[in-house]
Amino acid sequence: MSAHLEAVTQPKLRFAWLWWALGWLLVAATINESLQRNVWPVAKIMPSDKVMHFSGYCLLAIWFAGVARRSRYLVVGVFLILLGGMLEIAQGMMSQGRTADWWDFLANSLGIATGLGVAALGLGNWMVWIEQLLRPRN
């Protein structure tokens, strides 16, 4: 792992590279879903578009809070807010049935704040706990 990545990663994670890779796959899936026309079945079961935005960004915040050091939560939050904002702007520039909705951006931001708040209250070490549970016992 690079020195820069080590500086932002929780020191107790044995499989940090895997957690980061899976997190970036979640970001890629979020980008794809945001720019496509509701291709995922989850869009059909959510009670509201805003609930989907809130839930998705809350999940991203909790995910990256699990892999990042607590001192980097602000960076995680800023990155995710910028991602949500840029995707809304991109949707506004598209001509294929997607439109920018700043209420979506608000739902994203509230999801991020909730996810990071939950992480700061104690859930931030969830990846460490999973690795400890999966560690072979002698």
Show the residue positions of the predicted features:
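Bulky hydrophobic segments
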Residues: 2-103, 109, 113-138
